[in-house]
């Protein structure tokens, strides 16, 4: 709290500035003006001084109780009858520290003189107050000392306001006598006096009533007239005044106050007993115990009586001051004492996230209600579900809105979208090296070309060459670096395309000059086109005598690959892997293509990339080859790749060297993943391991569900379920044949099958057995594989079973065409055909109490069936279409009535007339044929 001035402090506490300055000087503070600053420490000193002056500084206990317990044994009896008895003695003593102990001798002497004067004054007041309770004693049959003592106590109570008034006029111990506190003290004293007077008046009324009842009860036993009873009452008056003359009344006062000090209250009837009770008890008991107590009280010393009385008076005044101060504090803090908690009066609305499916127990937990109550609400909606069953999103939304909460629809892919949004990289873009994939037929020199590039550009001058198993490496040219990916079988490339990742920037298509375009070459062209990646054609083996580059160029033109010399956009380079002819030109063409693409990446950001391949090495664990596309991958980063995650424990480059970080377009091997990721999976760097674990688990569950749903995705019978309504349906096929002639014949025949609604789309065709590449391509495009006189090997069959791809084998071309045509026919919408099965004429109409109007009919054609739809014709015009409600023959329900028989027909929700025709028909769906 900031410092305040003396004037501000006086205003806040409601005291005059002059008195506050005087008190501060008495407390030892050096403040003389109203503008002087007062710190928090000085406020505490002033408060401590004021508390000390008011007698509140000492907070130590003023009463102590000591307890002692001793156990002894005594022997009782004589002779053989002796026995030992344990005797336990318990003693308890209480010591009370008086206020007078802290007063010095001088003040004690002065207080003694004042006490004597006050005692005499109080005794006189007590003697004067005695006549107010005379009617109470007047009805007593026998005067006794005990009632006299109690009457003196009542008079002392009435004299309490006088004592308080006398005490306030005397000099007090407090040095802080503010006008406000004096007014409050006076008000408290006035209220106490009024309360005492009211209690005395009520007590007098009650005593008068009780005396009247006692007089009525004792009147039959009276032996003297009423004046004699009055004389007896007069005779009791001197007895009542006798204890006052002997100054025994002050002895009774501290007895009552001693009870008050021990917690019995300031009111005499606090425990349910009053003076009349004591009078009755003493009258019944006689002069035995009551007289003894009166004698003991009368025998008390005079001086101690006066001291006890003054102690009582001082305590009362001190209690009044304490009450005044407490009331002042309560009034000062009344506004700040409000409870901070407010009971909510409006309904609390929660926002509930609802996924596509949610368990009943989980929804109840989010709604903060009991599961039983939620199940009751579901039953009211017609949904029978237990606490562990899943309900759909729409039902959960209805429940949430019915309870008055807000529902937030959550998609299953929200976690992926949130992850992508949190991984958005922003920074300065820099030029990166191109990523090149070499593809082609295995016999066309692809491996020799890669070996020559590595030996000439990477391993020249290094002992041992490079590590072959990494499958990726970088080459430095005059125009920069180039990253090569070696992906045998192109499995990773297909997986990348399936996930929409463009890990490859340029494809080098290797074609042998002496062999021409082969099926694998066509497959590579289709892969490149599917990924929308530019192609650079490398015509290899140009050093051979049988090389014919022109023939290769013409064959590629026939496949849609147009060279720049023919007006296309594809670069053609003639190379030789043995002599090195055209290698530099090939690298130059790649660099030129990269410049056209303007490849850039962010360097100073979290790393992103793609997994090229993964394996498990003994002693090293999971080893994954990754290609960094964005950012910088560092050792120790937490990466998430598909369903696997972990920290990078080590990184190895293409030379087998340990590296600490890898930038964009850099392939490295990493160690530390918990399981091998799939080839083509994207990887990202995260900061939160818990989030990585959650995303990995979500992806694993999602893949499991997709595999369950994918078993029907590629089946011929369910192919139409994947097509969108209103669009031309397509049957996607991958064809493999034994010879090129058969393949061309099959392609031409399939192209002729189809119409405006369905068609066949051949995405890939080739010669030879069915390979894993074909299966991967079919998985990506949702196609079926057709093999003509070819088969799939064991690994391919296992992959097809795992991915749920349908492979069909044929040896006769007509069977292949018929099944494809049947599949296309199954994709066509069926045709609905109506057939009339029976006609009945209405000849009479009857009224039935159960069915209403019933038509008596004669079946004139076909058969009338009970459960088939009908039409009612009147004058050969259809006036009603519906169904039969009942069909009877001779009061018996029947399912059908044949031609020439009579029957009763009840038409549901319609009235028929005589002469109408009832036409029974059925609707059949007829499959359409191409």
Curated annotation (Swiss-Prot):
Keywords: Cytoplasm, GTP-binding, Initiation factor, Nucleotide-binding, Protein biosynthesis. Residues 486-489 are annotated as: G3. This is Translation initiation factor IF-2. The lineage of its organism: Bacteria, Pseudomonadati, Pseudomonadota, Gammaproteobacteria, Cellvibrionales. One of its GO terms (molecular function) is GTPase activity. It comes from Cellvibrio japonicus (strain Ueda107). It is found in: Cytoplasm. The keyword Protein biosynthesis applies. Signal peptide: none annotated. HAMAP family: IF_2_B (MF_00100_B). Gene3D superfamilies: P-loop containing nucleotide triphosphate hydrolases (3.40.50.300), Putative DNA-binding domain, N-terminal subdomain of bacterial translation initiation factor IF2 (3.30.56.50), Translation factors (2.40.30.10), Translation initiation factor IF- 2, domain 3 (3.40.50.10050). Residues 440-447 are annotated as: G1. Residues 431-600 form the tr-type G domain. InterPro entries: DNA-bd_dom_put_sf, EF-G-like_DII, IF2_assoc_dom_bac, IF2_II, IF2_N, P-loop_NTPase, Small_GTP-bd, T_Tr_GTP-bd_dom. Residues 465-469 are annotated as: G2. Residues 263-272, 288-301 have a biased composition (Basic residues). Belongs to the TRAFAC class translation factor GTPase superfamily. Classic translation factor GTPase family. IF-2 subfamily. One of its GO terms (cellular component) is cytosol.
């Amino acid at each position: 709290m900031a410092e305040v001035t003396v004037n501000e402090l006086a205003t806040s506490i409601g005291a005059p500035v002059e008195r506050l300055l005087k008190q501060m000087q008495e407390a030892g503070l050096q403040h003389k003006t109203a503008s002087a600053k007062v710190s928090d420490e000085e406020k505490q000193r002033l408060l401590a001084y004021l508390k000390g002056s008011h007698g509140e500084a000492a907070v130590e206990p003023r009463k102590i109780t000591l307890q002692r317990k001793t156990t002894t044994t005594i022997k009782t009896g004589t002779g053989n009858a002796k026995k030992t008895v344990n005797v336990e003695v318990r003693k308890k003593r209480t010591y009370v520290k008086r206020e007078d102990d802290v007063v010095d001798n001088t003040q004690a002497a002065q207080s003694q003189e004042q006490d004597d004067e006050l005692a005499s004054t109080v005794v006189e007041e007590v003697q004067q107050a005695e006549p107010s309770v005379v009617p109470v004693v007047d009805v007593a049959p026998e005067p006794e000392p005990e009632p006299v003592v109690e009457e003196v106590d009542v008079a002392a109570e009435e004299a309490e306001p006088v004592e308080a008034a006398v005490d306030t006029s005397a000099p007090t111990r407090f040095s802080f006598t503010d006008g406000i506190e004096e007014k409050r003290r006076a008000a408290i004293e006035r209220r106490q006096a009024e309360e005492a007077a009211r209690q005395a008046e009520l007590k007098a009324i009650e005593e008068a009533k009780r005396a009247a009842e006692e007089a009525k009860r004792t009147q039959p036993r009276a032996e003297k007239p009423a004046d004699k009873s009055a004389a007896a009452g007069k005779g009791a008056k001197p007895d009542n005044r006798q204890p006052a003359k002997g100054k025994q009344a002050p002895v009774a006062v501290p007895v009552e106050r001693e009870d008050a000090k021990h917690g019995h209250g300031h009111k005499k009837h606090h425990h349910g007993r009053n003076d009349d009770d004591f009078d009755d008890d003493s009258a019944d008991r006689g002069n035995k115990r009551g007289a003894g107590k009166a004698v003991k009280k009368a025998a008390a010393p005079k001086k101690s009586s006066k001291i006890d009385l003054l102690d009582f008076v001082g305590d009362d005044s001190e209690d009044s001051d304490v009450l005044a101060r407490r009331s002042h504090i309560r009034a000062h803090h009344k506004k700040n004492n409000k409870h901070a908690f407010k009971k909510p009066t409006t309904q609390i609305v929660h926002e509930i996230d609802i996924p596509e499916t949610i368990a009943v127990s989980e929804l109840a937990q989010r709604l903060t209600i009991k599961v039983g109550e939620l199940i009751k609400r579901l039953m009211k909606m017609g949904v029978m579900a237990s606490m562990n069953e899943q309900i759909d999103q729409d039902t959960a939304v209805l429940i949430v809105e019915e309870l008055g909460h807000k529902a937030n629809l959550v998609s299953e892919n929200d976690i992926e979208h949130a992850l992508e949004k949190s991984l958005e990289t922003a920074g300065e873009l820099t030029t990166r090296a191109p990523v090149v994939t070499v593809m082609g037929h295995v016999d066309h020199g692809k491996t020799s070309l890669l070996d020559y590039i590595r030996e000439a550009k990477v391993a020249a001058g290094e002992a041992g060459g490079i590590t072959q198993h990494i499958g990726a490496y970088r080459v430095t040219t005059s125009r920069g670096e180039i990253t090569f990916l070696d992906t045998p079988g192109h499995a990773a490339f297909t997986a990348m395309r399936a996930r929409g990742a463009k890990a490859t920037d340029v494809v080098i298509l290797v074609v042998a000059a002496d062999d021409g375009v082969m099926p694998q070459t066509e497959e590579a062209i289709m892969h490149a086109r599917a990924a929308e990646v530019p192609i650079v054609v490398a015509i290899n083996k140009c050093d051979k005598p049988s090389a014919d580059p022109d023939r290769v160029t013409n064959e590629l033109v026939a496949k849609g690959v147009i060279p720049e010399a023919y007006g296309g956009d594809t670069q053609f380079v003639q190379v030789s892997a043995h002599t090195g002819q055209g290698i530099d030109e090939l690298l130059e063409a790649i660099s030129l293509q990269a410049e056209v693409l303007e490849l850039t990446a962010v360097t100073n950001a979290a790393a992103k990339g793609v997994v090229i391949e993964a394996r498990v090495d003994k002693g090293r664990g999971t080893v994954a080859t990754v290609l960094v596309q964005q950012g910088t991958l560092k050792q120790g980063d937490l990466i998430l790749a598909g369903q696997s995650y972990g920290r990078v424990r080590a990184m190895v480059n293409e030379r087998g060297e340990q590296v600490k970080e890898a930038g964009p377009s850099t392939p490295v091997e990493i160690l530390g993943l918990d399981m091998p990721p799939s080839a083509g999976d994207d990887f990202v760097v995260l900061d939160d391991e818990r989030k990585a674990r959650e995303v990995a688990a979500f992806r694993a569950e999602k893949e499991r569900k997709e595999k369950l749903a994918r078993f029907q995705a590629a089946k011929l019978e369910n192919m139409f379920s994947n097509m969108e309504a209103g669009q031309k349906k397509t049957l996607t096929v991958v064809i493999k044949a034994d010879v090129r002639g058969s393949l061309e014949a099959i392609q031409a025949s399939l192209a002729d099958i189809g119409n405006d609604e369905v068609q066949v789309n051949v995405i890939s065709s080739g010669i030879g057995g069915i390979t894993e590449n074909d299966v991967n391509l079919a998985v990506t495009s949702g196609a079926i594989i057709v093999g003509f006189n070819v088969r799939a090997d064991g690994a391919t069959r296992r992959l097809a079973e795992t991915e749920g791809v349908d492979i069909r084998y044929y040896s006769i071309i007509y069977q292949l065409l018929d099944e494809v045509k049947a599949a296309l026919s199954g994709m066509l919408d069926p045709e609905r055909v109506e057939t009339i099965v029976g006609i009945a004429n209405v000849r009479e109409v009857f009224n039935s109490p159960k069915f209403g109007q019933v038509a008596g009919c004669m079946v004139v054609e076909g058969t009338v069936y009970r459960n088939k739809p009908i039409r009612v014709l009147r004058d050969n015009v259809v006036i009603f279409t519906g169904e039969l409600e009942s069909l009877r023959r001779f009061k018996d329900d029947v399912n059908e009535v044949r031609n020439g028989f009579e029957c009763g027909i009840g038409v549901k929700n319609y009235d028929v007339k005589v002469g109408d025709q009832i036409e029974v028909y059925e609707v059949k769906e007829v499959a359409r044929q191409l």
